[in-house]
Curated annotation (Swiss-Prot):
Superkingdom per UniProt: Eukaryota
Catalytic activity: [phosphatase 2A protein]-C-terminal L-leucine methyl ester + H2O = [phosphatase 2A protein]-C-terminal L-leucine + methanol + H(+)
GO molecular function, one term: protein phosphatase 2A binding
Organism: Caenorhabditis elegans
The protein's name: Probable protein phosphatase methylesterase 1
Family membership noted in the UniProt record: Belongs to the AB hydrolase superfamily.
Amino acid sequence: MSDDKLDTLPDLQSETSHVTTPHRQNDLLRQAVTHGRPPPVPSTSTSGKKREMSELPWSDFFDEKKDANIDGDVFNVYIKGNEGPIFYLLHGGGYSGLTWACFAKELATLISCRVVAPDLRGHGDTKCSDEHDLSKETQIKDIGAIFKNIFGEDDSPVCIVGHSMGGALAIHTLNAKMISSKVAALIVIDVVEGSAMEALGGMVHFLHSRPSSFPSIEKAIHWCLSSGTARNPTAARVSMPSQIREVSEHEYTWRIDLTTTEQYWKGWFEGLSKEFLGCSVPKMLVLAGVDRLDRDLTIGQMQGKFQTCVLPKVGHCVQEDSPQNLADEVGRFACRHRIAQPKFSALASPPDPAILEYRKRHHQ
């Protein structure tokens, strides 16, 4: 069915309704993308029970863990899926590719796609000769080289998705044309230039306020949840262990000391709004609650230059706190822009009687 027909399709909640609705296309895409999802597991009370804090393996979420050898450096990459468009996921500072674990699993149930989540320089299981050069220039070169190492000349459409620092790098990577394949879309999660630049002043204090070490992985996961750093126990159990490293028996410290990279922080975010608006591909900005858009983004939003999505009841790490809702939004966005196809077509289920009646009336 063409976009024009979708835009004029009546509200089919009532068989007799003839009022057109411009938002019907979104409703149909949501139905097509989410149709067939298993019903959510009923929540259970944890009162009186000890919450499980053990580490979850990467293999519960991804299909493959691969090394990308680039000029003597070894970048660890998590991969899910073997066909379809490529979703290239870039994590924020201090995290790893496993921050996307729950989201990747959810997205793969909705659309046919490949998900690729590298550990960037200095993070996770990646090993580089210079672990602390997190400059914008070095990192976007890394991102381009990792992609080429994994996919070669694959010309499948690519959707670059980045969170926080990774969101800034996604924008810079796209504008610098570091990925030769067809970049079809850009999704940036919880990074706005104005807010990010303001937050940098308190970042060192925040980093020093965290525990310097943990006696075990379980204690680190417990801190991650109790501090509100993550709100999803499953995400914390797979992501938090990759953010720390064992330095001695019963002592784990942070994988990367982000304070040593302070000189690069400003370069990640400065001029980001104009660069974001200058990207010619379809764009979506995902925010954790209501954020203040700066002047450039406010004007751009009013002009329809990008889509905004606000997810409620989440912290900064949206992909960990609400992976299902984020996957729904990303899946709908990808289908709307013809980047991906839903795995579960509405045609696979018994047709809605209202739709049949509408088609009968209009001889479709």
